[in-house]
Amino acid sequence: MAGRSTKKTAKTSTNKKSTKLAVKRRAAKLTLLAGGNPQIAKADGDAAVQAYIAAMPGWKREIGRRLDALIVRTVPGARKAVKWNSPLYGVEGQGESKGWFLSFHCFTKYVKVAFFRGASLRPVPPAKSKSKDTRYLDIHEDDQLDEAQLAAWVKQASLLPGERM
């Protein structure tokens, strides 16, 4: 009996170690919220946005990289932050920020790009919002991204008064 008890204790000890290790690994991984949107701590700067993009699941990560590169190319020196688990892009004004002009967010089947003053863009981005000013562009996995049109919207949006958040 003593031998059995020792084997069982050794086995239980091994299981506890494995469980603790698995819990630590899960805690180290990023959490994906509803629709696969990464949960990233609120922070200012490029590092937070890059952490968000790196945590975007599957094909959405490449969309995030392309969006970030296009925004930076179109609006050099754009201000970046992550708030409410979404990257935000803004422009510095005279002495203070003019506000945020764009954000994006992962959903189950698409990445939603939000133009906070989208109703003022020409042409107006296709998807409406509950907010009269905001318009969206939903990017699905197999969509052909019209980068010229997107860059035009980004440029226009960066010149408008931004959202204060």
Positions of predicted regions on the chain:
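Charge-dense, helix-prone N-terminal extensions
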Residues: 2-165
